[in-house]
Amino acid sequence: MVTTVGMESTLSGLVEDLILLEHDAIAAYEQTIERLQNPQYKQQVAAFKADHDRHVQELAQLASAVGAEVHREGDMKQMLTTGKVALASMMGDSAILTAMRTNEEDTVTAYERASRHSEATPEARTIFERAHADELRHREWMSQAASAT
C-alpha cells in the first residue's frame, strides 16, 4: 500500500494523519500478535507495538501544541493493514511477517517525509526522526525474521 502521509500542507494535518497511520499500525500489530505461532516472534512484535503506542502518545502531545485533532482509532486503511495479516496467517508466520514488513514500508515513508516537512518544528522533527528510526528497525527485523522462518 502506498501512503501519502507526510505530504500534507500543514503541520497539524500531518500530525493528524500520522496519528491515524499509527492507529492502523497498532491494529495490524494486534492481529499479528494474535496470529503468530512462534512465541519469540510474538514477544518481539509486542515490543514493536509498544513503540507504536508511544508514538501515539508523543503525537497526541504534539497535536495539542499545534491544534491538531487527536484521533482515537484508525481509518479505512486499517482494513487493509489488518486484512493483509489475516490473509497471510493462512500461510504461517513467515507470510504474516512479510505482510507486516509491507505495512512498515508506509510508516517508514511517512516518518521520513514528516522529518523533512517544511512546517516541522524542532520538537516535531525530533519526534518524527525518533519514530523513523523505530520504523526502520521494525522493518529490518520483519524482513530478517520472515526470511529465517
Predicted feature residues:
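Carboxylate-rich helix-loop segments that flank metal/cofactor sites and access channels
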Residues: 57-108
